[in-house]
């Protein structure tokens, strides 16, 4: 009888758990933005004439005045 259990034991191998598939996100799962606060509008007059990019100082001043904070905006990442 022990020979039976020995043979059965060698055939039963623990199978690795299948990797969980990540659920694919589609448009129906995404809702409207929450807690959105419109701070400023950047118009064509705010664009730099030479490079076509916003002038960092002007945009930062507009945002600072709109949000009412005295936060110092970092100039480390200027577009």
Curated annotation (Swiss-Prot):
Q: Where is the lipid attached (S-palmitoyl cysteine)?
A: 10-11
Question: Keywords, A to Z?
Answer: Cell membrane, Cell shape, Cytoplasm, Cytoskeleton, Lipoprotein, Membrane, Palmitate
Q: Which family does it belong to?
A: Belongs to the CDC42SE/SPEC family.
Which InterPro entries does this UniProt record tie to the protein? CRIB_dom (IPR000095), CRIB_dom_sf (IPR036936), SPEC (IPR039056)
Q: Does the keyword Lipoprotein apply?
A: yes
Q: Where is this region: Disordered?
A: 41-79
Q: Which Gene3D superfamilies match?
A: CRIB domain
Function recorded in the entry: Probably involved in the organization of the actin cytoskeleton by acting downstream of CDC42, inducing actin filament assembly.
**Protein's organism:** Xenopus laevis (African clawed frog)
User: Where in the sequence does UniProt note compositional bias of the Basic and acidic residues kind?
Assistant: 63-72
Top-level taxonomic group = Eukaryota
GO aspect biological process, one term:
regulation of Rho protein signal transduction
- Any one GO molecular-function label of the UniProt entry: small GTPase binding
Cellular component terms per the entry's GO annotation:
cytoplasm; cytoskeleton; plasma membrane
The CRIB domain is annotated at: 30-43
Q: Please give, as recorded in its UniProt entry, the membrane topology of this protein.
A: Lipid-anchor
Q: What is this protein called?
A: CDC42 small effector protein 1-B
What is the primary gene name for this protein?
cdc42se1-b
S-S bonds: none
